[in-house]
């Protein structure tokens, strides 16, 4: 059991006051280990809110440096950070918000060679990318390792997210394989409203905190979508497919795959 300091009691007082969280829930948060893949549009708000909440360890995977075009939506990075590795920039902001948080940085591409080794160290994974090959890689690695994760994706004015727990519908239950190269425009080609990243990222952060505290109902077997133009939110039921190639009763995928695909630079 954590022996809370007076500073921690004050820092997390608004959580502790919640009947559904309390001291016990905050302790679970502070003992949690979360991996955020991508320190970009989605990874930025996720990391900031999880750090503020007191997540014990946050791992960040990103192989890119901050670009001026990132600053329109990637709020964890500042103008002074242009040219700096995103993991370094993100770590600096996380520690500034909450020095209690331990930060693990991975300045590398997540791929089939390292995904399982990295993911196994964490309790919950957040997909903060907008890159189809990596999304399928995260899904497959988490299913293989029995890890829960939050999927998120945004483009133009739209966003979508769902949460996977072992035994529930996975990304491949919805989308069997990545689309053909060039079939879906990237964010650098189609654009994205900056605030959309914050809208979806904070939902992913909330799902992460709900997972550790056991609050409410997670977005399992449901895909939440929204259109910021109309501010309409929809929840679409998603069934776990027994024939799914990775999580079905007779999986046909027994190793991780590095798909080739034009990548959206939202996470870059």
Say what each PLM segment does.
Residues 1-268:
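Adenine nucleotide-associated cytosolic modules
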């Amino acid at each position: 059991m954590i022996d809370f300091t007076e500073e921690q009691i004050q820092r997390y007082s608004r959580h502790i006051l919640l009947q559904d969280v309390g001291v016990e829930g905050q302790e679970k948060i502070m003992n949690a280990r979360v991996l955020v893949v991508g320190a970009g549009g989605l990874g930025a708000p996720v990391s900031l809110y999880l750090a503020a909440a007191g997540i014990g360890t946050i791992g960040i995977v990103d192989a890119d440096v901050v670009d001026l075009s990132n600053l329109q939506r990637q709020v964890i990075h500042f103008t002074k950070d242009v040219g700096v590795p995103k993991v370094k920039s993100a770590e600096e902001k996380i520690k500034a918000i909450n020095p209690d948080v331990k930060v693990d940085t991975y300045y590398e591409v997540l791929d089939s060679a390292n995904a399982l080794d990295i993911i196994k160290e964490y309790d919950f994974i957040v997909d903060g990318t907008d890159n189809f090959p990596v999304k399928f890689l995260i899904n497959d690695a988490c299913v293989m390792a029995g890890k829960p994760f939050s999927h998120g994706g945004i483009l133009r004015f739209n966003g979508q997210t769902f949460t996977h727990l072992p035994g529930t519908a996975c990304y491949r239950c919805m989308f069997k394989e990545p689309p053909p190269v060039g079939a879906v425009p990237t964010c650098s080609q189609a654009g994205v409203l900056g605030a959309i990243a914050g809208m979806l990222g904070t939902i992913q952060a909330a799902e992460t905190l709900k997972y550790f505290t056991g609050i409410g109902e997670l977005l399992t077997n449901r895909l939440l979508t929204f259109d910021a133009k109309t501010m309409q939110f929809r929840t679409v039921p998603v069934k776990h497919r027994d024939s799914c190639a990775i999580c079905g009763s007779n999986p046909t995928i027994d190793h991780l795959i590095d798909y080739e695909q034009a990548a959206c630079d939202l996470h870059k």
